[in-house]
């Protein structure tokens, strides 16, 4: 009796599919390239030559993140071409809050069975995000792990590295009482709060992924899969000409948890709730889920994706510049004195 020969493909890992995928994404990767990139993808590591002549004391800033359960909605809608934008946004928006220019990005994609076309669609979004952020996609890892994930599901992680002059690191230490808080509009939920959003919209409201959201004129998929905004170019533009004392990326924890991360001791943020237009999706969820206001501001960005802390005397010029950059911005509050043991954010 002839012995059966077992291959890696029989075990669920298709090396040929992986090679096909790499060839499919090469043009997408090339579209993100910068002059400092020294090699194409496919090597064991990405090579990036930092131009030391541009800096006096360069400091590298790194960040890593994922997109959480927003992926579940991508699975339901079978839409995968924008989720990569979210991945890049979550990472680069984190490192620009310290004043760092994003230089390069790497991604990790894990799935039970690799579908080259779907994976290439995902990387299309990653490439688009890198183009928006001005950083190069220099490498990544695609892990095919049979039996580890359910059906066609996958998970993603991203890794960004940027650079900032040591003397220009933004750490919030120069924030003072009287500084103004400027909020940059979000595009929707971005990539946080989706576990609660799914519970309210899919379970409590009983809507399907292709159903219309009442009063929005959009389907659940269209609204909830809107890509996270990437603020890199606007923020870097401001940093060249203005004093920005602090920056907060409004992610998990919302305004209530993220703004305090950049405030020095003795300071609090006073936020005027009626100073910006809260997108309707947040009002729909709050009403349908009977969600308390504090819970909304502690879970979602509520329409503000990035907060700048700036000197009062520069706030007007900064708002004018932001308008010229096509940013929708609002003066949402100010920094005030905070007594020890008190809350760091007041909603008024």
Curated annotation (Swiss-Prot):
Its EC number is 6.3.3.1. It is found in: Cytoplasm. InterPro entries: PurM-like_C_dom (IPR010918), PurM-like_C_sf (IPR036676), PurM-like_N (IPR016188), PurM-like_N_sf (IPR036921), PurM_cligase (IPR004733). Pathway: Purine metabolism; IMP biosynthesis via de novo pathway; 5-amino-1-(5-phospho-D-ribosyl)imidazole from N(2)-formyl-N(1)-(5-phospho-D-ribosyl)glycinamide: step 2/2. GO terms for biological process: 'de novo' IMP biosynthetic process; adenine biosynthetic process. It catalyses: 2-formamido-N(1)-(5-O-phospho-beta-D-ribosyl)acetamidine + ATP = 5-amino-1-(5-phospho-beta-D-ribosyl)imidazole + ADP + phosphate + H(+). NCBIfam families: purM (TIGR00878). This is Phosphoribosylformylglycinamidine cyclo-ligase.
